[in-house]
Amino acid sequence: LDLFYTVRKSRNQYWIFRANASSATTIDGTQTDNGSKRLLWLDVNADAECHWMKQLKTTFLYSRQQWSPSHGFQEGTYTSNIFVVDTQYKINSRNTVRGEVQYLQSKDYERDWIAGLAEYTFAPSWSVYATEMYNLGETKKHYYTAGVSWSKGKTRVQLSYGRNRAGYLCSGGVCRYSPAYTGVNLLLTAAF
């Protein structure tokens, strides 16, 4: 289910509202004692994008995610509430600064997280960025990254240094597993 709505005050000042929901359950009730289906995944999202003026926009996002760590074989799901504020300011046609703050609230797994990003883009090819992610729950660990990227056509080169946690990194619908590490990362992305 997807919903979209725009409220326009003027040509350069307007709000865009979006909402999306999706879910998946087990195919039949054979995995449960009472014959009911079990939740595998639930994803409910709402965001509001405000264009304050031609150069400045802010996006507010809320996402509620529930998923079954046992893929429906056992009862119980993990639940996360995610809040994001992203602000972008176009200094001129070639320079943009962007900041983002995220908060993930959960009583499950590693519990609460907070993250931030600062990025400066020199159009059309260069950007520099710094990120910080901190676990407020179980581990109390900081994960930081600073880097630079260059793009031309369908090719992108990124050089960064930081402390990264293990997990899947997804970009453009392509995901890869990355082990935990602290160090330098060189990434080349090309589309054919």
Regions from the PLM with identified roles:
Residues 1-192:
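Exposed, low-structure sequence patches enriched in small/polar residues
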